[in-house]
């Protein structure tokens, strides 16, 4: 039996940052209280509690003197207000992608626009998003629920539409198409994070190559359940939280088994499940070697990378960087030197690009990339080779001046 571990399996940078921060506070002997379970992984939460962390349902439950950790899901504005009223110290581990949605929600309220949120109304991330707008808001889980809102949507002067960061990518694309056709006054923001997009895309591809798929992660984890849905469309798929839940008989007859894991799944649990599945992983490749093969390669300024376009706006496009869990941003000025160029004319969703890394940001997991710099490097190389080979090159004259032409 061959076992293939997805490159995107395991902690995303947002979850990793929240977990790392909380462990560091506990190691310093600080009294820590998290608002809700820090992540949707019972094993990690239990370990944190064994080291002294307290899980509280609300700010009212936080003991005096405790330092509050706001989890990556984020919270509504009223929660920040309560923390301030109680004068509690707090550490904000909200995922930057979620923070971006909070700002959009606040803007919707300020501009009198209705806020549409694609997601699970009971999920803490969605509840936090809703808590940042002061205007009318509706949450829908799928196209059918969105269609039921149409009579109300047609009465709105302005609509802002966002998605939970872990929402199903295909479902979001379908909902966006509906909004574009039915609501000309809707401003649609692509807010599914790159880690979610890349994880679902890899699960889609991997599940089509495998006889079985094992999805490791919390049963209450939104992104884990989305991965299970994606994988189950193409092959037999199962969700396990720990190695103890894996029924080895379920694997009987499978030649190739794919393994992926949700954003809240630590590598230790992935290792336990893999070891439970087989003592001979990929021709005796150890878990450490297998994990190393799946881990993202470091990015640095000047590195040339391949990326796929996830979303396009008038001012920038968002890309998924091959071999990385980071998101890439390409500004219009870094896509073309043409002052009249429009981003939607330059690239489309799913286009594959060669880009140069301009700046990395490990804290937020968002990197700045450039197409024009890649073209400049490639152009210089082509010119050098042409000079050496005596090749005649052609180009467009953009401007004539006293010194010649540009």
Place the predicted regions along the sequence by residue.
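Single-stranded RNA-binding regions, centering on S1/OB-family and related RNA-binding modules
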Residues: 279-406
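The feature marks the mature, well-folded catalytic cores of soluble enzymes
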Residues: 1-280
């Amino acid at each position: 039996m061959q076992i293939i571990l997805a490159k995107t399996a395991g902690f995303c940078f947002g979850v990793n940052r929240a977990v790392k921060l909380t462990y560091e506070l506990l190691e310093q002997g600080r009294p820590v209280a998290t608002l809700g379970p820090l992540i949707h992984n019972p094993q990690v939460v239990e370990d944190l509690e064994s080291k002294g962390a307290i899980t509280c349902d609300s700010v009212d439950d936080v003991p005096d003197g405790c330092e509050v950790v706001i989890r990556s899901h984020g919270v509504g504005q009223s929660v920040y207000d309560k923390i301030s009223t109680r004068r509690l110290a707090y550490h904000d581990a909200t995922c930057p992608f979620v923070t971006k949605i909070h700002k959009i929600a606040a803007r919707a309220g300020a501009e009198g626009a209705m806020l549409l949120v694609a997601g699970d109304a009971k999920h803490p991330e969605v509840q936090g998003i809703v808590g940042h707008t002061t205007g009318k808001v509706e949450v829908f889980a799928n196209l059918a629920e969105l269609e039921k809102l149409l009579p109300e949507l047609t009465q709105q002067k302005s609509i802002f539409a966002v998605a939970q960061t872990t929402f199903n990518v295909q479902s979001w694309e379908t909902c966006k198409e509906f909004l574009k056709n039915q609501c000309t006054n809707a401003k649609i923001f692509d807010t599914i994070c790159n880690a979610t997009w890349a994880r679902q895309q890899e699960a889609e591809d991997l599940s089509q190559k495998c006889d079985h798929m094992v999805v490791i992660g919390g049963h209450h984890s939104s992104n884990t359940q989305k991965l299970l849905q994606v994988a189950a469309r193409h092959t037999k798929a199962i969700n396990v939280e720990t190695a103890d839940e894996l029924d080895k008989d379920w694997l009987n007859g499978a030649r190739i088994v794919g393994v992926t894991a949700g954003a809240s799944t630590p590598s230790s649990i992935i290792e336990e499940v893999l070891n439970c599945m087989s003592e001979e992983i990929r021709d005796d490749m150890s878990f450490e070697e297998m994990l190393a093969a799946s881990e993202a390669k470091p990015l640095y300024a000047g590195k040339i990378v391949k990326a796929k376009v996830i979303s396009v706006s008038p001012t920038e496009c968002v890309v998924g960087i091959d071999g990385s869990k980071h998101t890439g941003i390409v500004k219009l000025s870094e896509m073309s030197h043409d002052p009249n160029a429009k981003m939607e004319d330059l690239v489309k969703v799913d286009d594959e690009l060669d880009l140069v890394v301009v700046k990395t940001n490990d804290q937020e997991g968002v990197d700045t990339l450039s197409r024009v710099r890649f073209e400049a490097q490639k152009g210089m190389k082509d010119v050098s080779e042409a000079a050496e080979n005596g090749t005649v090159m052609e180009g467009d004259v953009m401007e004539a001046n006293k010194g010649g032409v540009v």
